[in-house]
């Protein structure tokens, strides 16, 4: 049982965050690690809180202590190893997995995790082998069928489709999010087989399950976007003190499924760029600004009136979190979703930052979003109408920020990049302050872990085959067209 002091430290950390005092919250979590017990169920909550504010080292250590809780539990260990893989500590995860006894190593959920690790690293043949081994032991694992569906291409008459259809009635008894994931996998199978109407019905069924669990409030986001566009003007931003942190930083922004992972992969293929991903660290660094509005930024600046470089401090914290995440001070590519909501503060805080903003055909992007089972943070993607509303807001933000920062934001059209990489890759490199290197033109050969839904696409050469993919679903996209075009 946790002592009163231990409970108080965690509650005090939460209270500090409510006051936007991120530094105090981190101090309390570090103190908890120093003085807290070596194990216990409560460490899972500590890990989750630390992850939310970007303190990955604390999150990992707390997850490790949770995994050591008595009595021994494979489920807790799997949670810890999954956290390690999420933060690119796959070598450590594999090391511990390798110490399991042969019977434990052949548990279906262990095989599933090993398959996930293999897939993230681009070894799809090994991932498929491990998933099939898991399914041979337990054919009724919906999540493993989904994982297998994401890395293979189905064909008419594929026995895997029949096996998934046979399992479908049983999935009605599992929790909705797991059933939804399975339905997305089955939909992808029928999509591969060219059965687009059947696939769309399954995607819609899965999306309805997710929508019932996770509602999106378009009116709230519209108010937020209205405020950003109204308040963040060149004249208003002159009220913010300049940032003294001039280190370069690379960002790739754009809607999900718009080609952001492709550009990330191209940049990571440069010798000066160490890695990249959806790291979710800028939001954490900006916690002291509160709601990320201009008023919040001015309040933060007022609280820090006695400090020499308040915006440089936030930038330094961001770079510290990046170094913790990737283990390097070299350049990394941050392609976290929805940086458009913080773009004004991002470019003010990081005067050395350069942004590549991807744009893609709206209907192709909308369909791809609707067909993707996002794990979190994309509640608008469970409805074609909501996708249209979200895209309209993002269009407004792109127009606003690119007009305000034309020298720092480069807009790249996915269709043009895919069709003419020899023209666009040098332009992207120049914008990011990089010399062109041959490896950037063969980015699919760059080996690294990829955690996004584009894990397969970045392993293949740049191609135009994904342009126009929405045509097969055109009759189903009318709800998107109505809300997007107004």
Q: What are the functions of these language-model segments?
A:
Residues 16, 50, 84, 118, ...:
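Residue at a conserved register position within TPR or TPR-like alpha-solenoid repeats
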Residues 146-152, 161-173, 182-246, 301-302, ...:
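PAPS-dependent sulfotransferases, especially Golgi type II membrane carbohydrate sulfotransferases
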């Amino acid at each position: 049982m946790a002592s009163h002091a231990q409970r108080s430290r965690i509650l005090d950390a939460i209270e500090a965050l409510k006051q936007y005092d991120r530094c105090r919250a981190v101090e309390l979590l570090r103190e908890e690690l120093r003085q807290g017990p070596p194990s216990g169920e409560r460490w899972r909550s500590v890990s989750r809180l630390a992850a939310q504010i970007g303190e990955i080292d604390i999150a990992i250590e707390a997850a490790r202590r949770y995994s050591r809780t008595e009595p021994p539990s494979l489920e807790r260990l799997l949670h810890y190893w999954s956290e390690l893989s999420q933060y690119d500590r796959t070598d450590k995860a594999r090391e511990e997995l390798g110490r399991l006894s042969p019977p434990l190593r052949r548990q279906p959920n262990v095989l599933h995790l090993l398959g996930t690790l293999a897939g993230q690293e681009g070894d799809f043949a090994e991932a498929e082998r491990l998933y099939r081994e898991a399914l041979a032991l337990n054919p009724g694992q919906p999540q493993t069928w989904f994982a297998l569906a994401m890395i293979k291409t189905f064909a008419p008459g594929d026995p895997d489709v029949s096996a998934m259809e046979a399992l479908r009635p049983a999935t009605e008894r599992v929790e909705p999010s797991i059933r939804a994931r399975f339905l997305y996998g089955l939909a992808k199978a029928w999509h591969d087989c060219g059965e687009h109407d059947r696939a769309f019905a399954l995607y819609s069924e899965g999306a309805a399950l997710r929508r019932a669990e996770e509602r999106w409030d378009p009116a709230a986001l519209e108010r937020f976007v209205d405020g950003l566009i109204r308040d963040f003007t060149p004249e208003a931003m002159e009220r913010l003190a300049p940032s003294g942190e001039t280190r370069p930083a690379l960002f790739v922004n754009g809607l999900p499924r718009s080609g952001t992972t492709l550009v990330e992969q191209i940049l990571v293929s440069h010798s000066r760029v160490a890695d990249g991903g959806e790291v979710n660290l800028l939001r954490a660094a900006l916690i002291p600004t509160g709601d990320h509005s201009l008023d919040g930024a001015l309040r933060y600046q007022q609280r820090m009136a006695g400090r020499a470089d308040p915006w440089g401090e936030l930038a330094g914290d961001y770079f510290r979190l990046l170094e913790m995440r990737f283990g390097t001070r070299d350049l990394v590519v941050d392609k976290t979703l929805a940086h458009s909501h913080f773009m004004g503060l991002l470019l003010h805080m990081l005067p050395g930052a350069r942004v590549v903003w991807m744009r893609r055909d709206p209907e192709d992007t909308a369909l791809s979003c609707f067909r993707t089972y996002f794990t979190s943070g994309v509640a608008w993607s469970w409805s074609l109408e909501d996708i249209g509303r979200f895209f309209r807001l993002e269009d407004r933000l792109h127009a606003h920020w690119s007009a305000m920062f034309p020298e720092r934001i480069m807009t790249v059209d996915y269709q043009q990049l895919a069709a003419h990489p020899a023209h666009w890759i040098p332009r992207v490199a120049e914008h990011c302050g990089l010399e062109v290197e041959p490896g950037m033109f063969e980015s699919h050969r760059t080996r690294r872990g990829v955690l996004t839904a584009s894990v397969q696409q970045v392993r293949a050469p740049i191609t135009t085959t994904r342009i126009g993919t929405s045509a097969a679903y055109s009759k189903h996209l009318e709800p998107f067209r109505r809300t997007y075009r107004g």
